[in-house]
Structures are given as C-alpha cells and as structure tokens.
Amino acid sequence: MPDFRYGHAAAQDWKQAAEACITQLGQGPASLGFLYVTDLLADHLGDILAHFRSRTGIPHWVGTVGIGVCATGREYLDEAAIAAMAGDFEPDSFRVFSGVASAADVDNVALKCGGATPNFAIVHADPHNRHVADLVSRLAGRVESGFLVGGLTSSRRQNLQVADGVVEGGLSGVSFADNVTVATRLTQGCSPLGPKHVVTASQQNVIISLDGRAALDVFKEDIGESLARDLNRIGGQVFAGLPIAGSDTGDYLVRNLVGIDPANRLIAIGELLQPGASVMFCRRDTKTANEDMTRMLESIRKGMFSRPRGGVYYSCVGRGASLFGPDSEELKMIREALGEFPLVGFFCNGEISHNRLYGYTGVLTLFV
C-alpha cells in the first residue's frame, strides 16, 4: 500500500490556495490524486486541476466540489479553499471512471483495474441526476465487495466533479482492486425517539396511517408532549428514519419531514413509501451526534493494527459546524481518535455508503 501526502489551504485567489497545497504535498512519487474544492472556486475547477497536474506530475485525479471541504483536523466552510491528497498506487490497482448518467452507462463503464476485477470504488455523484440513487445501487453491483463510498456534490454554483478532467451529470470516481485495503464505517448522528412502525396507508410520500392509526397521532406520541405542543419547533431536530432491511448494525436512512397536515393528521417525508414499509422517528442533536461519532471511531480503531496511511471523509452539509461546533470539531474528533494521518474530503449533499444514498451521515474510509 502506498503512503500518502496531503495539503489544504484557503485563499481568495485559487492560485494561492493551490500553491499552498502543492507546497504541503511536497515531492515524491504519486499516481493518483484526490482534489476537493469549495464551491466558491467551482468556476475555476478546470484551471485548478490543470495546475495541480502540471505542478505535481500526478497523472490521475478524482474529486468534486463542496460547500465545504475538509482535511486532517480542519474544516473549510463558506470560504474559498482546496484540499488535496496524493498516493502512489500500483498502475493496475485502480481505474478512474466517469460518464455514468444512466443504467446503460453502469453496464458499459470500464471499471477493471488492469486485468483485475474491481473490489470497491470511491464515487462522486451529481445530485441533479434524478436516477442517482438507482445508479449508486447498480454500480455497487459491479464491484466485487458490493461496496461504494463517496458523496453527492454540494454547490451553489456548478455541480462539477473531477475524473481525469472536469465532468458533470452523473457518477464518476475511481475503482480499486483487492490489493488496495481499506476500512470504512458510517456514523448516523441520530437516535430513535420511538419504536419502528408499519405504514398501513400512504400516498406517494404522504403517510396516512401507521400501525392502523392516524400518522400524526403516532408521531406526536413518539416525539413527546413538549415538542408535540408546538410542531413549529421540530424543524432540523426530528426526522423520519427508514430501517434498512437485513442490516446487522441497525442502519437506517434519514429523511426530512417535509410537511404536516394537522387537520387530516397526515405527515409527508422526503421519500416515496408503500404500505408495509417500516418507519420510525428520530432526533438529531449535538449530544447524539458526538456519541455516535465516538462509537464509529472506536469501532474502526479496534479493527486496525497500525495508524492509517491515508483516508477520505464524506460528511453531510447538515453536520460540521452546525452540529459539532465552529472550530472544526468533527474533524478534530477523527484526529484525536486515530492520530495524525493524511485525510481529505468534503461536505456532501448526500452520502454514499455500501450501495445506498444516506443523509445526515459521515462516511470515513481509511487506507490501511
């Protein structure tokens, strides 16, 4: 496995930020680079990529744009910044891919690493592609482990990605052969407020009844009397959780509550539901997020025999400073638990883990 080098910097002028990163990267062999830029620099992404390739000599690059980017112990949110990492992988151990915008593209995209079957992949996705969830699931079926990690571009400008060039519109990233060893974990940051319920009547994303009772009545019982008295207070605190069938870790997909109809006692969530589906309600707050982050980091640490060589971290834009605090607290937790090692990533508009899209999660992947 290669060793990794990394750099990160903020500057209004993209060249200043890029040069600061390149200086930190230093000299040494590298075959693959990871490049994340904040959306304030999105309009210059092509120039930034060309500059990194020219100045470092690294031939292959992957990455994307985020409202925020991150590096070891550091978060850059709402400022012009770049985070980059480089590793010297064997030539036949990885393959950069792009142009996956439809089901047919998933079937046809070249993922083999030399002659080796791809084992897993790091993926960046365009949130404006309405098939993105299905594309992620299908692409996971093309890699041997069935495991993808990554995130959806988050940008107030262009939703651009890097895959040996600047691309957009679908999925891109890099696949790896099984001689590239990784460890990965996910942290949810929410805690259930009540038991699982069965959807007994629904229409598209509107829940009519749960367990044979009016959906809003069940919801109010679960969230408790204090919140139920003033439903205007639940925004950003209470979410719908959709348990993942067959998960041995109790994982669930977190979806926003998008509407409440008190007169008809209905609830609308950010997901289409069929009768028979399971749903629960959960709460997101700083205490819960810290506890689950600590659990995740302890879990991944216990499975390691040495310090990570490098890593990537993909966290929801709804986490970071708004959930953990303003002084890069989320990234500092990783450093404190696992030590100082090269790490880069970005704050996503949806996170990819295994074969699914998540929300309000953090996905940590370590090269070991």
Which residues make up each language-model segment?
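Small-residue-enriched flexible segments
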Residues: M1-R53, P59-H60, T64-F324, S328-F341, ...
